[in-house]
């Protein structure tokens, strides 16, 4: 069973977070941008988002953040929450957990979200007033991914494509 580490203000970001960011940075940024838009729509504006699936540049179908939350809701018996958060000089670091009570699985995820986000082609940085909400949602998303069986995710992708058409 995973153990939790609480990071105090001033601690370095865990190496795994740095490694994840280093792998496929562009694909990661595209996925993050898509998820950030949905976080704002879903959690802050309370809009209904029908797009649960999208196709990556590698031509693979994957779930959006909305799709992951919907899969957790339909799977049932998934408890999700925020364990810890801290504000650093330039970002939020949020730790979330997910418990699959049916299968007795537990996972934690840590996400770092910068206060400033690039805008447009020039990449000038502007203050992101939703950075804390984004960090929470991304941490929950990452925790949920590990406690629901992969075959269930795949069957839900097929169902979402059939019912909602998905985003290509």
Q: What do these predicted regions represent?
A:
Residues 1-168:
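Polyanion-binding surfaces on beta-sheet-dominated domains and ring/shell assemblies
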């Amino acid at each position: 069973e995973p153990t939790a580490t609480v990071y105090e203000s001033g601690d370095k970001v865990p190496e795994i977070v740095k490694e994840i960011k280093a792998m496929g940075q562009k694909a990661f940024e595209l996925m993050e941008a898509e998820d950030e838009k949905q976080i704002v729509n879903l959690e802050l504006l309370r809009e209904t988002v029908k797009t649960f699936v999208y196709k990556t540049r590698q031509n693979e179908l994957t779930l959006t953040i909305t799709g992951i939350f919907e899969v957790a809701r339909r799977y049932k018996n998934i408890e999700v929450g925020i364990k810890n958060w801290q504000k650093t000089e330039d970002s939020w670091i949020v730790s979330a957990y997910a418990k699959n009570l049916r299968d007795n699985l537990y996972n934690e995820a840590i996400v770092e979200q910068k206060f400033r986000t690039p805008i447009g082609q020039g990449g000038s940085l502007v203050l992101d007033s939703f950075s804390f909400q984004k960090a929470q949602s991304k941490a929950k998303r990452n925790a949920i991914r590990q406690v629901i069986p992969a075959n269930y995710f795949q069957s839900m992708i097929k169902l979402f494509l059939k019912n909602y058409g998905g985003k290509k």
